[in-house]
């Protein structure tokens, strides 16, 4: 077995382990953030400052009985959370999380694969995760799950179109689909960040990413007041945990990608080293998603579709045309 294969396997194991752990810890952070906005304490009983609440929740999750409803398609019911997990973690393959560094005289590239269509790969594999809620809803033999999967189809497909068109303008400016090249394009300094050249693309992509991530106010797939837990209604134990980890893994992936594409990525930020800079940026966007959840109410499905097709899509197309004209001039 070659050194390259061994290195890649080690990177994959580290990526899955780190982001699985971060997914669990993110629940604690989100509960604390929401509690702060709502003037509550949040988790505070299990361990100092409630830090061991994550471990307690993990033990409870793994010891719960794994129930499959009567009349459900067992194979597809089991396959759906696996698709969600695989889609979330495989989409991270082209993301450069940190600048290259040397360890014991060996240069380490902190990404799985630097492919020249990295951004397209990220969007395509992430979009494949749409099959998880669709199959989960269809296989559960539950009306609420079925409604949730139908909402997943219209919401995720609609916003996948918007996010893809939105990101075309920044890619036209850079001239590459590689996330490493996009990062290097902004290495000149603060004013080279693409957010200043493509502010409309940033806003549209951020909104579309929240819709794709099923984050409030766009969590129509599992709206508690209307359809219980949506496509997850019949899931429990480890299978439910896989959906939950996949959702947070997608959140971290989008936070890193937004930081790389629009905010200079892992380039040094003044006196702040690049590795720390990208952690600050990605951490801010994770926090922003929690802030939005605490601030905005749910939207109706018709409002969401109107915003997608009548507002965001025309703006994305207009941005592409204007960017093309500016490049030609």
Curated annotation (Swiss-Prot):
Its main location: membrane. It is found in: Cell inner membrane. It comes from the Bacteria. It is a multi-pass membrane protein. InterPro entries: NADH_UbQ_OxRdtase_su1/FPO (IPR001694), NADH_UbQ_OxRdtase_su1_CS (IPR018086). The chain crosses the membrane at residues 9-29, 42-62, 75-95, 117-137, 154-174, 188-208, 238-258, 269-291, 309-329. It catalyses: a quinone + NADH + 5 H(+)(in) = a quinol + NAD(+) + 4 H(+)(out). This is NADH-quinone oxidoreductase subunit H. The lineage of its organism: Bacteria, Pseudomonadati, Campylobacterota, Epsilonproteobacteria, Campylobacterales. The gene is nuoH.
């Amino acid at each position: 077995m070659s050194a390259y294969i061994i290195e890649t396997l080690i990177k994959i194991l580290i990526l899955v382990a780190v982001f699985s752990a971060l997914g669990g810890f993110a629940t604690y952070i989100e509960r604390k953030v929401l509690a702060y906005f709502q003037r509550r304490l949040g988790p505070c009983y299990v361990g100092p400052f409630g830090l061991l609440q994550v471990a307690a929740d993990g033990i409870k999750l793994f010891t719960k009985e794994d129930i499959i409803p009567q009349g459900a398609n067992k194979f597809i019911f089991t396959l759906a959370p696996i698709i969600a997990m695989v889609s979330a973690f495989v989409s991270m393959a082209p993301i450069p999380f940190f600048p290259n560094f040397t360890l014991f005289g060996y240069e380490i590239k902190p990404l799985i694969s630097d492919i020249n269509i990295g951004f397209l790969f990220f969007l395509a594999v992430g979009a494949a995760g749409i099959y998880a809620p669709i199959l989960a809803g269809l296989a559960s033999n539950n009306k609420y799950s079925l409604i949730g999967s139908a909402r997943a189809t219209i919401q995720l497909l609609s916003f996948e179109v918007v996010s893809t068109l939105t990101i075309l303008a920044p890619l036209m400016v850079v001239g590459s689909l590689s996330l490493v090249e996009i990062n290097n394009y902004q290495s000149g300094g603060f004013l080279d960040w693409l957010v200043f050249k493509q502010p409309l693309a940033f806003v549209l992509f951020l909104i579309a990413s929240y819709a794709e991530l099923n984050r409030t106010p766009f969590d129509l797939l599992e709206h508690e007041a209307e359809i219980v837990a949506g496509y997850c209604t019949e899931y429990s134990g480890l299978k439910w945990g896989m959906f939950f980890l996949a959702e947070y893994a997608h959140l971290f992936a989008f936070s890193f990608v937004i930081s790389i594409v629009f905010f200079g990525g892992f380039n040094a930020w003044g006196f702040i080293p690049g590795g720390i800079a990208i952690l600050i940026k990605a951490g801010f966007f994770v926090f922003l998603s929690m802030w939005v959840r605490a601030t905005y109410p749910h939207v109706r499905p018709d409002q969401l579709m109107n915003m997608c097709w009548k507002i965001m899509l025309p703006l994305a197309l207009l941005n592409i045309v204007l960017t093309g004209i500016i490049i030609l001039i």
